Amino acid sequence: MLRNIILILAILFLLESISFSLSANLTLGLALLWLITVSLFIGVVFYQPIAAFLSSGIGIWIKRIGILGIVLYVGMMAFLGLAASFTQATGNEQAIVVLGAGLNGNEVSGTLRRRLDAALAFAEQNTDLPIVVTGGQGQGELRTESSAMKEYLIKKGVPADRILLEDKSTSTRENFLFAQRVLAENGYENIREVAFVKNRFNCYRASLIARRTGLQPAAVPATISITAALPCYLRELPAVLYYWFIRRS
């Protein structure tokens, strides 16, 4: 029975791994997804010896530690998914900051499009707030992310003079720091309360980073596609742990 469950999980993870591999570059999330897939198939092929090892001696402790690790990982992923709701934007903020993501050629990617659509919906309800699109030119990209973002919003009907462009940043921290600079250069000085737009899975870490740049952030969480959700959450947890215990800035 358990072996059949593992086999079903292995097949599902394989389909997810292949699907995401066809639409994304190699990332930590994708690598972890393939690692889990391979591990599940190994578990199916060598089920009997593995089960025997885990049923006695040190194997019992390895099994307990493994189960605990899985529970903690799943719990943390659930926390990351819910965290954006704790500090959700209300419309009382002073500006909207849309953080960049990868491009597909000259066009915004699916992930970035979802952020821009979330920003657009929020901006339509709060027409007095300036919009900062922030993102430089990543490796292998044909243009800056912010230029593609601005173009997308203009096509959706946002006035060009409402959109401020920040095209030098290469990290989340720089997104927030340079966005503040662009706001100040355009007459929006001493902006501290911002509504930032990110996909739900990384709103928590982005909020921590924003606070350390002197901002009072509130999240406008964007959705994410079903195929991208699992690898993105798998990648985000190590990033959060790295930020908690190593970088802290």
Question: Could you say what each language-model-derived stretch is?
Answer:
Residues 229-249:
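A transmembrane-helix-recognition feature enriched in membrane-embedded lipid enzymes
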Residues 17-25, 78-85, 247:
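Transmembrane helix-loop junctions and nearby membrane-interface residues
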Residues 65-79:
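Single-pass alpha-helical transmembrane signal-anchor segments
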Residues 1-49:
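Membrane-embedded alpha-helical segments of integral membrane proteins
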Residues 6, 62-66, 233:
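Hydrophobic alpha-helical transmembrane segments
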Residues 36-68:
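Cytosolic-side transmembrane helix boundary signature
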Residues 75-235:
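A structural signal for short, hydrophobic/glycine-enriched beta-strand patches
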